[in-house]
């Protein structure tokens, strides 16, 4: 299994949804970075379950630093982080051992490995993403030391959607972080959709933006910045689509409508618009990075659907009432998208340092 992401700055996540713990090992973090357990609290709180309109599973998601940090400073050696699973309830999954859960990875895992841990999705569960968010905290610290800021936010919920990319600012970050849905969309409309559809789930879109990036992040051909971001984002559970800049809408434009004209002033050369999303030839060009990730509706819903037992018998399937699931995974995916953005950018930043003497 591919459990590692990154080249110079890399992470390896481990653990299952209903195991005793999950965690991550980070390689390539420079020495001397300030780091304490308290640094993880805000980001982990944005991803953790048990909050409004998310899975009722109660996980404190406190991060324990096992290695790579001494006297609150990174040492340059591998950093190992542990997150205990405190609220594991596997009983609701016992009745599912003999049938396939529609929309879940169990069927694929059994086909590939001949065996699967079906408790809460096992390794395929979104629980794994808590490890990515923890690693992303370290990546964000490195980016901030280089004056690079990033933000992800919910830009689509069901039929509600905004395709605008706002300019990143402290006030925007504060607005997103204080929203219960981490969004700029009308919160009352989201709440109404949830209240009117208590037995169903919703898809969503998470947008990400950055401050202007340094020129040169990304490599030609197979190491392009958008390509690496696409791989990072599409590795998130339930992600079903990715675009950068104008994305799919650019296929409906003419060349004259799409082109970003170059302009120049006393600060240098820049673009009049940013439909390219901040990269040309797969390399950052000093513009903000802008993109979006689409997430499917949660597969675990209260409405019945058809499935089969492992012996092929057709059955009417209903998610167990005691199961604990998100009505919209995109809400908590905001923190995960931001973490994967940060991890990708730090890795490319360190790679770029190797391109010139």
From Swiss-Prot:
FMN binds at residues 123-125, 281, 296-300, 324. Keywords: Amino-acid biosynthesis, Aromatic amino acid biosynthesis, FAD, Flavoprotein, FMN, Lyase, NADP. Pathway: Metabolic intermediate biosynthesis; chorismate biosynthesis; chorismate from D-erythrose 4-phosphate and phosphoenolpyruvate: step 7/7. Pfam families: Chorismate_synt (PF01264). The keyword NADP applies. Its cofactor is FMNH2. One of its GO terms (cellular component) is cytosol. It catalyses: 5-O-(1-carboxyvinyl)-3-phosphoshikimate = chorismate + phosphate. The keyword Amino-acid biosynthesis applies. CDD domains: Chorismate_synthase. One of its GO terms (biological process) is amino acid biosynthetic process. Its EC number is 4.2.3.5. Disulfide bonds: none annotated. PROSITE patterns: CHORISMATE_SYNTHASE_1, CHORISMATE_SYNTHASE_2, CHORISMATE_SYNTHASE_3. Gene3D superfamilies: Chorismate synthase AroC. NADP(+) binds at residue 47. It is an enzyme of class 4 (lyase). One of its GO terms (molecular function) is chorismate synthase activity. Reduced FMN (FMNH(2)). PANTHER family: CHORISMATE SYNTHASE. Belongs to the chorismate synthase family. Homotetramer. This reaction introduces a second double bond into the aromatic ring system. This is Chorismate synthase. It comes from Chlamydia trachomatis serovar D (strain ATCC VR-885 / DSM 19411 / UW-3/Cx).
């Amino acid at each position: 299994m591919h459990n590692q992401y990154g080249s110079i700055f890399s992470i390896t996540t481990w653990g299952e949804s209903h195991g005793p713990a999950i965690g991550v090992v980070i390689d390539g973090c420079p020495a001397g970075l300030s780091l304490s357990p308290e640094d993880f609290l805000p980001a982990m709180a944005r991803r953790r379950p048990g909050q409004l309109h998310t899975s009722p599973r109660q996980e404190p998601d406190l991060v324990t630093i096992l290695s790579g940090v001494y006297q609150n400073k990174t040492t340059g050696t591998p950093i190992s982080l542990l997150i205990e699973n405190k609220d594991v309830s596997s009983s609701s999954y016992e009745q599912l051992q003999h049938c396939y859960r529609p929309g879940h990875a169990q069927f694929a895992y059994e086909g590939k490995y001949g065996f699967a841990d079906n408790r809460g999705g096992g390794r395929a569960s979104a629980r794994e993403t808590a490890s990515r968010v923890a690693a992303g905290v370290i990546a964000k610290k490195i980016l901030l030391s280089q004056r690079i800021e990033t933000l992800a936010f919910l830009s689509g919920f069901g039929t509600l959607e905004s395709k605008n990319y706002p300019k990143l600012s402290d006030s925007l970050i504060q607005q997103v972080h204080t929203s219960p849905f981490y969004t700029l969309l009308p919160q009352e409309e989201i709440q109404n959709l949830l209240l009117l559809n208590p037995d169903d789930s919703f898809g969503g879109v998470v947008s990400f933006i950055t401050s202007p990036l340094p020129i040169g992040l990304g490599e030609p051909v197979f190491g392009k910045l958008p390509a690496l971001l696409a791989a990072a984002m599409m590795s998130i559970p339930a992600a079903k689509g990715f675009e950068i800049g104008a994305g799919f809408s650019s296929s409906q434009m003419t060349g004259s409508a799409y082109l970003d004209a170059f302009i120049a002033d006393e600060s240098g050369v820049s673009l009049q618009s940013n439909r390219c999303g901040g990269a040309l030839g797969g390399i950052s060009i000093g513009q903000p990075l802008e993109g979006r990730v689409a997430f499917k509706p949660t597969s675990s819903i209260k409405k019945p659907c058809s499935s089969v037992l492992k012996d092929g018998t057709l059955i009417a399937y209903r998610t167990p009432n005691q199961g604990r699931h998100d009505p919209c995974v995109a809400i908590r995916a905001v923190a995960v998208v931001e973490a994967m953005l940060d991890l990708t950018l730090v890795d490319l930043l360190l790679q770029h340092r190797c391109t010139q003497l």
